[in-house]
Amino acid sequence: MLNDSKIAAYTAILQEELLLATGCTEPIAVAYCAAKLREVLGGKPEKILAEISGNILKNVKSVVVPNTGGRRGIDAAIAVGIVAGDADAELQVIANVTEADVAAIQTYLDSTDIRVTCPETPCLLDIKLTGWREGHHACVRVANNHTNIIYMEKDGNILRELPVTGNAEDNLQDKSVLNVQDIITFAETVPLDNIRPTVGRQIEKNTAIAAEGLQNSWGANIGSTLLESSQDWATQARAWAAAGSDARMNGCEMPVVIVSGSGNQGITASVPVWKYGKLMGADDDTILRAVCLSDLITIHQKTGIGRLSAYCGAVSAGVGAGCGIAWLRGADCEGISHTLENAVAMISGCICDGAKASCASKIAMGVSCGILGYDMYAGGNNFRPGDGILGDDVEDTIRHVGVLASQGMRETDRVILKIMTE
């Protein structure tokens, strides 16, 4: 059993990470910053300078911003935030946009000078918007986390100023307490009332958007394409996860519970585990514990990687889902550890080239590797310590992945952004 302080810490991590968001979180962060700019300035800016970090540009460029009439990109995210955003709603800042607002977005874009630049910054997530209106100006800056305002100013009067660091974990729960053994123990023994409000809502919201992704045409329809070829349980688990991303990346307005700042990761960590559990006849409480395990394994991996990087986050969530499914299949700590290491050995290095329709296919691939990772273990086959980036044990391997992503792939990130913006 875990002590009370560790149970409280793990519960707090889930409460902090499993947040409800409408739309891909990077354009939503831009819209949130824009809504706050309008609030500070006292009206809609007539001119805007947007200073945006490369990783935000990458993740906003190709994804459809919900409630904008199918528009994509930084300008659309700024415009919807200015015209109709509710800053108090944070990650649901554009959840209540009306049809009249959608029409007003184009009018605002046509009449407003919006200039976008990409300055050097120590923060991978960095959004600074400066606006001018009727002789006044204001500035709002969000950094490190999607709703973390570190600076606000109007007409030279500083309203808020926090230190700028490049650490996305600043002011968040200490995640150094996470380890695979304790995650499993927590998932197996935590009182269900501790996790039902967060993980239960995650299952409800994320399976709903996955169903929408299968019922209607969204993006490249990866989910429904997978189901055309097979109906076995593994394909269904992959397809349902991919379908949620099909819808989310292509402008579906249904909210999603995120993990590590990402809706795709929130979907991937939960939906395939839920689907497998349902197909195998597991009860709802058991599925809740399995998704909890998947979430925490995903968060544990992502702590070293960072919220935004050149390393595809859906891969980490796919590995987490594989571990959750392995637990439902009877795996203990040894089996789950080998599942993670086997999967990481297969798929590490998959790049993030921005939020877009093809994320759904990467999700399917990540979940597939997670499932295969346990199948290998169950058959007595495992990759060994020292095979590539695999460490002496699972915690060592997770650290290696963090170093690979946060340090080794920095130049990869710059090259991806250069290709995307040329």
Language-model regions: role of each:
Residues 1-11, 44-58, 232-251, 283-301, ...:
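Acidic-glycine-rich active-site phosphate/pyrophosphate-binding loop
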Residues 2, 21-25, 55-59, 63-66, ...:
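A structural signal for small-residue-enriched, beta-sheet-centric alpha/beta enzyme cores
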Residues 10-19, 56-65, 247-258, 298-308, ...:
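Glycine/charged-rich beta-loop-alpha catalytic/anionic-binding loops adjacent to active sites
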Residues 20-36, 254-271, 312-316:
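Conserved phosphate/anionic-ligand binding catalytic regions in large, soluble enzymes, centered on
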Residues 31-124, 131:
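Early transmembrane hairpin of solute transport permeases
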Residues 38-40, 66, 276-289, 299-365, ...:
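Hydrophobic alpha-helical bundle architecture
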Residues 44-48, 89-94, 116-117, 193-199, ...:
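Flexible, glycine/charged-enriched surface loops at secondary-structure junctions
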Residues 109-251, 416-422:
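Signature of multi-pass transmembrane helix bundles
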